[in-house]
């Protein structure tokens, strides 16, 4: 498994979502109530950029058509069995690492 260290600029503020390049691809990083989560940046509905979405009531909302995803699991309530792949984040001291193997 390959871990990549994220820089402080790669980490969103509490309640925010950002896109970051990791290993040549865009990843969505979410700060939900002070906890960090990472997932693919592509919405499975129409390919919207999830890292440009918003957090509403604990869900990540796609900016294109409003599909909502749980940042912890990648699951949506819109369609059974549909989810966005997530990535594990590990905190070691002041450093945050992303595991680039999809969960």
Protein language model regions, located:
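Short, basic/low-complexity N-terminal boundary segments at the transition from targeting/disordered tails
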Residues: 1-7, 64-75
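Iron-sulfur (Fe-S) cluster-binding segments and ferredoxin-like electron-carrier domains
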Residues: 49-56, 68-81
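Short cysteine clusters
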Residues: 43, 62-65
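Short loop/turn motifs at secondary-structure junctions and domain boundaries
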Residues: 10, 60, 80-81
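N-terminal pre-ligand scaffold of iron-sulfur
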Residues: 1-57, 86-103
């Amino acid at each position: 498994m390959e871990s990549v260290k994220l820089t402080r600029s790669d980490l969103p503020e509490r309640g925010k979502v950002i896109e970051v390049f990791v290993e040549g691809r865009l990843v969505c990083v979410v700060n939900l109530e002070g906890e960090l989560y990472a997932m693919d940046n592509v919405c499975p509905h129409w390919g919207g950029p999830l890292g440009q979405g918003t957090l509403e009531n604990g869900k990540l909302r796609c900016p294109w058509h409003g599909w909502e995803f749980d940042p912890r699991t990648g699951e949506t309530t819109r369609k059974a069995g549909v989810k966005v792949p997530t990535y594990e984040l590990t905190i070691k001291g002041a450093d945050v690492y992303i595991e680039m193997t999809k969960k």
